Swiss-Prot record:
Part of the 30S ribosomal subunit. Contacts protein S5. The interaction surface between S4 and S5 is involved in control of translational fidelity. It comes from Ruegeria pomeroyi (strain ATCC 700808 / DSM 15171 / DSS-3) (Silicibacter pomeroyi). Residues 94-157 form the S4 RNA-binding domain. SUPFAM superfamilies: Alpha-L RNA-binding motif (SSF55174). Gene3D superfamilies: Ribosomal Protein S4 Delta 41, Chain A, domain 1, RNA-binding S4 domain. Belongs to the universal ribosomal protein uS4 family. HAMAP family: Ribosomal_uS4_B (MF_01306_B). It comes from the Bacteria. GO terms for biological process: ribosomal small subunit biogenesis; translation. Transmembrane segments: none annotated. This is Small ribosomal subunit protein uS4. It holds the Pfam family Ribosomal_S4.
Length: 206
């Protein structure tokens, strides 16, 4: 098992949920957490526990972001007009690695980060190797010509369990994606329930 594969399954086990909806997730086979005490019945979670869990789930979903990275994004969401939770989702979905994952250019968000880091992605015709790069409406994201036949790309395109959301216009024959608009929470095809409102509550108290 690769380090990236291990990381994503570790997050699933930690959360006790198959947060990316992957068929091979270990939580599909059991309903308890990792470790020797994982089978003990869980008590009712406190409000703080629910808020912390919501934050950890979102951080994990986008590639196990560090607290510093996530807190910075949250701070931006807080400063923008509108609902902070919705703003947070919009900013996370505008990350280049998130767009590469959503477009089904790679099979996992971890692979998306590496894919961008290694220079396989162009934005408006220019190579961008920063996973946190923030795309704008109308930006065209594409896989470099020499990277289109990589095994990870071919695997991702064939994945039936993942749909491309309607805020992207994707042409897999050309391996291009246009970022049409910033999504709202209800637009994002999460495999599990995400609760950014609880993240807002968490940071309001901590």
């Amino acid at each position: 098992m690769t380090k990236r594969t291990s990381a994503k399954y570790k997050i699933d086990r930690r959360m006790g949920e198959n947060i990316w909806g992957r068929p091979k997730s270990p939580v599909n086979r059991r309903e308890y957490g990792p470790g020797q005490h994982g089978q003990r019945r869980k008590g009712k979670m406190s409000d703080f526990g629910l808020q912390l869990r919501a934050k950890q789930k979102l951080k994990g979903y986008y590639g196990d972001l560090t607290e510093k990275q996530f807190r910075r994004i949250y701070g931006e969401a807080e400063r923008v007009k509108g609902d902070t939770g919705e703003n947070l989702i919009g900013l996370l979905e505008r990350r280049l690695d998130a767009v590469v994952y959503r477009a089904k250019f790679v099979p996992t968000v971890f692979a998306a980060r590496q894919f961008v880091n290694h220079g396989h992605v162009l934005v408006n015709g220019k190579r961008v190797n920063i996973p946190s790069y923030r795309v704008k409406e109308g930006d065209v994201i594409e896989v470099r010509e020499r990277s289109k036949q990589l095994a990870s790309v071919l695997e991702a395109v064939s994945l039936a369990e993942r749909d491309v959301p309607d805020y992207l216009e994707v042409d897999h024959s050309k391996m291009t994606a246009t970022f049409v608009r910033t999504p709202h929470l209800g637009d994002v095809p999460y495999a599990v329930v995400m609760e950014p409102n609880l993240v807002v509550e968490y940071y309001a108290k901590n």
